């Protein structure tokens, strides 16, 4: 079952309102205020939509308001049932410090079609479109995955570019990539934006190879599904996190999730820029109005577009 195309613009409006709210805190050195600035207007907009939405990927537990928390019901509670994966402000640090790649993001699918990932780490490899299905595997060596990718893309290994989150936990991956001659492009934060540099007509990277957030992995999968890209992820769970994962219906703690297991059906993805970034330009304050730019995808409609809108102050 596909999602009615009318919902795309409604969800775009929600991320636009979130981005405008967050933009008022750009460079103000206050991550928490910036996050709240996005959450409140986004929640208000989502609650206007005729749907019964449930947050399956959110920012925290119920007692951590003002977050959009896991299990929260959104919408008028009349209409289709949707799973919602949301990060009202991806890049709170980027916003507070006036750095690139902060945005407001949401992914929507029919109820039961999004993986409910706990807020834990997830190993991830992501690649773009037009490649053999299930090409790469987290249990392969880095060298084997890169060799397979180079062959599939008909490129020399030395011409491949890998995006890696700059963390000491990735030292072994970086060492292996460097030894075989892959160019490494580091990101300091911003797991979603980093992983999505593998898509587009002229992608900045050929592969994303990092351990980042589990919830972010599902949001990335939503966008990649619309593009025909691929991701494989595996949750990294300690004992407490295993208990939380069980409550979300996860039984196999070592399971490798491919894209079709993270996003099962139709999906909408919207990301509105707060600061300028790879996905969209940031909010522009034009004096009497705000100019906002959104990167929007709808899988069943094959929609891939960038939309610019204006809001009076």
Predicted regions and their residues:
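Gly/Ser/Thr-rich helix-start
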Residues: 59-61, 76, 92, 213-214, ...
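An extended, acidic
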Residues: 139-289, 293-298
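Conserved phosphate-binding loops in N-terminal lobes of ATP-dependent enzymes
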Residues: 1-33, 104-146
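N-terminal subdomain of lithium-sensitive/metallo-dependent phosphomonoesterases centered on the IMPase/IPPase/PAP
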Residues: 1-85, 147, 151, 178, ...
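DPxDG-like acidic metal-binding loop motif
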Residues: 79-90, 94-115
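Short capping/connector residues at structural and topological boundaries
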Residues: 73, 99, 127-132, 197, ...
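Generic structural "secondary-structure junction" signal
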Residues: 57-59, 69-71, 76, 110, ...
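Short basic, glycine-rich beta-strand/loop surfaces that mediate nucleic-acid
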Residues: 74-75, 104-107, 204-208
């Amino acid at each position: 079952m596909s999602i009615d195309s009318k919902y795309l613009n409604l969800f775009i409006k929600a991320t636009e309102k979130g981005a405008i709210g967050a933009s008022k805190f750009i460079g103000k050195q206050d991550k928490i205020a910036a996050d709240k600035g996005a959450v409140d207007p986004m929640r208000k907009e989502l609650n206007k939509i005729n749907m019964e939405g449930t947050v399956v990927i959110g920012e925290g537990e119920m007692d951590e308001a003002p977050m959009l928390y896991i299990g929260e019901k959104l919408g008028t509670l009349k209409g289709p049932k949707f799973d919602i994966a949301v990060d009202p402000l991806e890049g709170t640090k980027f916003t507070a410090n006036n750095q690139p790649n902060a945005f407001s993001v949401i992914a929507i699918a029919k109820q039961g079609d999004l993986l409910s990932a706990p807020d834990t780490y997830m190993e991830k490899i992501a690649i773009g479109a037009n490649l053999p299905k299930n090409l790469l595997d987290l249990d392969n060596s880095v060298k084997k995955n890169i060799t397979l990718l180079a062959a599939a893309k008909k490129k020399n290994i030395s011409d491949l570019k890998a995006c890696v989150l700059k963390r000491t936990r990735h030292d072994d991956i970086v060492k292996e990539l460097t030894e075989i001659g892959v160019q490494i492009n580091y990101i300091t934060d911003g797991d979603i934006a980093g992983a999505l540099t593998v898509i587009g007509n002229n992608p900045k990277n050929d592969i994303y190879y990092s351990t980042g957030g589990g919830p972010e992995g599902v949001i990335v999968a939503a966008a990649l599904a619309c593009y025909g890209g691929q991701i494989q992820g595996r949750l990294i769970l300690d004992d407490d996190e295993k208990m939380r994962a069980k409550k979300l219906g996860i039984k196999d703690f070592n399971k490798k999730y491919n894209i079709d297991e993270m996003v099962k059906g139709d999906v909408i993805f919207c990301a509105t820029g707060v600061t300028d970034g790879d996905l969209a330009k940031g909010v522009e304050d034009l004096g009497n109005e705000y100019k906002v730019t959104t990167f929007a995808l709808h899988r069943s409609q094959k929609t891939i577009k960038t939309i610019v809108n204006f809001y009076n102050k």
